[in-house]
């Protein structure tokens, strides 16, 4: 048994001790606000056949923790004792057992030892939510994903293109990939020493080392690792002393065949106020661009998150989110979480109308208003039919199908009700609109060409 493992020879105090460590790790990792919201009222109940049973105060908190944090909690328990195979979260006390509430300090812990989130060979905290398994791959990020995976799977060797330089806008997945590399190495090659750190934190630690006359220790720390990952390297632009130290750290690691992974919001050639010699070295290896998300990728990300969270979301809501929240993945996931949380707290069903109301401020700030008239004009032009055909009752396929598509897009891209949309299409009733939307949704299941056509129309309308 590892020296970090806590022997669980009975089902009493030792299990309670493990829960206290896990609770502290959760507090330290997620912070006071999130801890108090979700974990502070969770109690240890008992253990049974290598299963730890915890009690949440409400069904909502139980379900939320199960969907978002269950794997994190299990991994933390297993760090302290790998005999624990599963956790169960209930909302009732088990008769004859004693609840154990872990009281935590109001300040963040500064020194928690033996944490699964901060092991001796992984410096700086890795976010357990970000793994390769839950990274959704699409055309905009497939090169970056493949390269990150190759780095992680190199098993002690150095990826042939060193450093790996990932760049792209905010919230597109660069940080996710860096955490995924760290977690993969930690799980499969635990003897390898990995540092993941933001460039800002790198600078602050360097300044602190200068102030405390501990520069030698700083150099030893960063130049003795197997993998160094620095996030948001653009932060050191214009900071000459930090650039000098980074330059020498970079050279030492590359010369010793150690892996480097760097992320940035722009390509190396576009960095300003940074030394040319650093700019040149950042481009030595593989430079992978993480592009803005496509509609298909956003759809995949939403479906993956919904599956992880084990919730049911109507198709029209998913399509609406994928078409409307286009800036970045972080905002997309935030919008989904907001919709789900609103439903859980208010006990209102998740519908397209409710979603549009919940996100109206976000949508207003994101893009211009699209009207039903805009959609009718663009679709008519795209399919080379008369605008008047949108209001007619003609059933010829070459007219009826574009009209159905326009109704579908009106439901997805505008806040109008079915009845209001029907009025815009020659005073048709809401059942006609509903039938059109359902027909298009059924076709989208298998018709790739139609899916691409609708994606193109969305881009035309949104731009």
From Swiss-Prot:
Keywords, alphabetical: ATP-binding, Cytoplasm, DNA replication, DNA-binding, Lipid-binding, Nucleotide-binding
A Pfam cross-reference name: Bac_DnaA_C
Region (Domain I, interacts with DnaA modulators) residue spans: 1-84
Annotated region (Domain II), positions in chain: 84-124
SMART domains: AAA, Bac_DnaA_C
PANTHER family: CHROMOSOMAL REPLICATION INITIATOR PROTEIN DNAA (PTHR30050:SF2)
Identification of the protein by name: Chromosomal replication initiator protein DnaA
